[in-house]
UniProtKB/Swiss-Prot annotation:
Functional note: Acts as a chaperone.
Family stated for the protein in its record: Belongs to the heat shock protein 70 family.
Inducing stimuli: By heat shock. Acts as an early heat shock protein, induced within, and reaches a maximum by, 5 to 15 minutes of the start of heat stress. Levels decrease over time.
Keyword set, alphabetical order: ATP-binding, Chaperone, Nucleotide-binding, Phosphoprotein, Stress response
Recorded GO MF terms: ATP binding; ATP-dependent protein folding chaperone
Pfam families: HSP70 (PF00012)
Signal recorded as keyword: no
Protein name, UniProt field: Chaperone protein DnaK
Gene3D superfamilies referenced in this protein's UniProt entry, alphabetically: 3.30.420.40
InterPro entries membership: Hsp_70_fam
Organism of origin: Anabaena sp. (strain L31)
Note: On the 2D-gel the determined pI of this protein is: 4.7, its MW is: 70 kDa.
SS bonds (residue pairs): none
Length: 32
């Protein structure tokens, strides 16, 4: 079910990369 749901997969990956990394990526994208 999780594999069939793109949103769940996205959240899983987000949890794997962790908050600091996600924040850095978001900050980088925001700066660009």
């Amino acid at each position: 079910q999780a594999v069939m749901n793109p949103e769940n997969t996205f959240y899983s990956v987000k949890r794997i990369i962790n908050e600091p990394t996600a924040a850095s990526l978001a900050y980088g994208f925001d700066k660009k």
